[in-house]
UniProtKB/Swiss-Prot annotation:
Keyword presence, Cytoplasm: yes
Occurrences of domain LisH (ranges): 51-83
Domain of life, per lineage: Eukaryota
Composition skew (Low complexity), residue ranges: 178-199, 307-323, 398-415
Family recorded in the similarity comment: Belongs to the MSS11 family.
Keywords associated with the record: Activator, Cytoplasm, Nucleus, Transcription, Transcription regulation
A cellular-component GO term for this protein: cytoplasm
Protein name, entry field: Transcription activator MSS11
Residue numbers spanned by region Disordered: 1-33, 177-331, 396-452, 477-517
Chief place where the protein resides: cytoplasm
Protein's gene: MSS11
């Protein structure tokens, strides 16, 4: 049987009851949007079952708020938007819009506000120079954890309340100077963190087994405990192991206030000793001597340690904390992005240079082609000019040759004697005369063959004469004037007929001793030749 002090089990504290209570609370929240009075369903983020439906609800609310009605209808039909009550999918045919009631909402919709905040953060990171981000003070200063602190007055009051501890260290009711208080306040935060890390090293041992030179009292560690130095980034400072001096000057550790409170109820070392009073007095005097002997070297050691702390704080820096590592990673990422951007810019510049070189090469080729085309045109023009000049020269040469031929023809015609015509003209009377003369010679030859015995002096003279060329100016002795032995000058004009002695010429119709009737020249009428060839040339 259970006693009267036994508790009765509360049915409301069971897990099942808690779950039912949570469901009822959720139902109460949804009732304000899913009441029975509302006939048509509506879109609400309170009915979202997962993050995707929550996003769909806010997207739909954003579209309706900004009057994108067609897009909202299509989105309501295609997306799984959370509704206040179950509706068949075929009923959402895209003809009507549903109202939206959102728990998380704002004047410009929650989706827009959320995106605006992200965009502002992104713009700040993009527009702020990297130097300003890396030179922020919180990332470079020493980070000291914020711990509960005890005001100096309370610490002094606690020190005074300890009783025999203060006179043992020589602080008999004296006030600590201000300089020491400032130094103690600066070191208090470091001591609190170190003491928190050293809690697992604090164990109780026998008083005689320790080698530490520090004095012991009711509020200090046991003499046998050696406190190791912390392995953190902070430098060792005075008072790593609490003792009478530290308790007197720095106050009571706030984490061990309970031990101090319990020390009042616990018997003091003088009351707990079992031996005689003499032994107790000897022991107390020994402890006082040890404490007095230890105060002097510790004072010197404190000054040295303070110097070491100040110097080390200037030289050594704390190890990077989590925020510094994040900042370092951020700077590395920014540097990588800058390097990538620089590489991309270099690649773009190289591509632009290549394109410019290609364009220059194409322009040079086009210029060369134009020059070649111009040279070809010039060459063709020169050839045409040369041909035209050659044709002109040929025409001039032909014209000059024709003129020379005409002049030569004229000069040759001037040297023709009277009675001779132009030898090139076959139709002239002179040519007819020569033909008649040849016909006559042929006739004479035929008569000589028929009558060899009948000799004719005129015929004999004709046979002895050689045929002369048309250009010869010598006349036979029997015809006209006798030829002289001197050669005729071609450039010399023929003498006029007035100077010719006509008396020496014989009549062609009457010859002496001509007995043959065929030799009568009456049939060759040459009376008209005198007028045509009187000047040696056809008029």
């Amino acid at each position: 049987m259970a006693g009267p002090g036994a508790r009765k089990s509360n049915a409301s504290n069971t897990p099942q009851d808690k779950k039912m209570k949570g469901d009822s609370i959720q139902d109460q929240k949804n009732k304000q949007y899913n009441s029975g009075d509302v006939v048509e369903p509506f879109v609400s983020d309170a009915m979202a079952k997962n993050s995707k439906q929550l996003l769909y609800a806010h997207i739909y609310n954003y579209l309706v708020h900004n009057q994108h009605h067609d897009t909202a209808k299509k989105f309501l039909q295609e997306a799984n938007v959370p509704l206040s009550k179950a509706v068949p999918q075929h009923s959402l045919n895209g003809d009507k819009l549903l109202n939206s009631k959102m728990l998380m909402n704002s004047p410009d919709t929650f989706l827009f506000e959320w995106w605006q905040s992200l965009w502002a953060l992104n713009q700040y990171v993009e527009t702020t120079p990297i130097e300003n981000l890396t030179s922020l003070k919180p990332f470079n200063d020493r980070i000291v954890p914020i711990l509960p602190q005890v005001p100096p007055q309370e610490m002094l009051s606690r020190v005074v309340r300890t009783g025999p501890i203060a006179p043992a260290m020589g602080f008999a009711g004296n006030i600590v100077p201000q300089q020491q208080q400032q130094q103690q306040q600066q070191q208090q935060q470091q001591l609190q963190q170190q003491q928190q890390q050293q809690q697992h090293f604090r164990t109780m041992t026998s008083p005689g087994s320790g080698n530490t030179p520090y004095a012991t009292n009711a509020n200090s560690f046991p003499a046998g405990v050696r406190v190791p130095q912390p392995q953190g980034s902070f430098q060792p400072v005075l008072g790593t192991t609490p003792n009478a001096g530290t308790n007197a000057g720095l106050g009571v550790n706030p984490y061990h206030a309970a031990t101090l409170g319990s020390s009042k109820s616990t018997p003091k070392p003088q009351n707990t000793s079992v031996g005689s009073k003499n032994k107790q007095t000897k022991k107390s005097s020994a402890t006082n001597k040890d404490s007095g002997a230890n105060t002097k070297p510790r004072a010197n050691g404190e000054s040295k340690q303070f110097k070491g702390v100040n110097s080390s704080s200037k030289v050594k820096k704390p190890s990077p904390s989590g925020s510094q590592q994040v900042q370092a990673n951020w700077t590395k990422l920014q540097q990588k992005q800058q390097q990538q951007q620089q590489q991309q810019q270099q690649q773009q510049q190289q591509q632009q240079q290549q394109q410019q070189q290609q364009q220059q090469h194409q322009q040079q080729q086009q210029h060369q082609q134009q020059q070649q085309h111009q040279q070809q045109q010039q060459h063709q023009q020169q050839q045409q000019q040369i041909r035209m000049q050659y044709q002109k020269m040929m025409t001039l040469m032909q014209h000059q040759q024709n003129q020379q031929n005409q002049q030569h023809h004229q000069l040759g015609n001037q040297n023709i004697l009277p009675g001779q015509g132009d030898p090139s003209d076959n139709s002239s009377p002179s040519q007819q005369y020569l033909q008649q003369q040849r016909a006559y010679e042929n006739m004479v030859k035929s008569q000589q063959q028929d009558q060899p015995m009948n000799k004719d002096h005129f015929a004999m003279s004709l046979q002895t004469q050689q045929p002369q060329s048309f250009d010869s100016y010598a006349m036979p002795a029997t015809m006209g004037p006798q030829a002289s032995s001197q050669p005729l000058d071609n450039n010399k004009k023929s003498e006029p007929l007035s100077k010719i002695d006509v008396t020496n010429n014989q009549d062609f119709n009457t010859f002496s001793g001509g007995s043959n009737n065929k030799l009568n020249f009456g049939q060759f009428d040459m009376s008209g030749l005198g007028n045509e060839f009187m000047g040696g040339r056809k008029q």
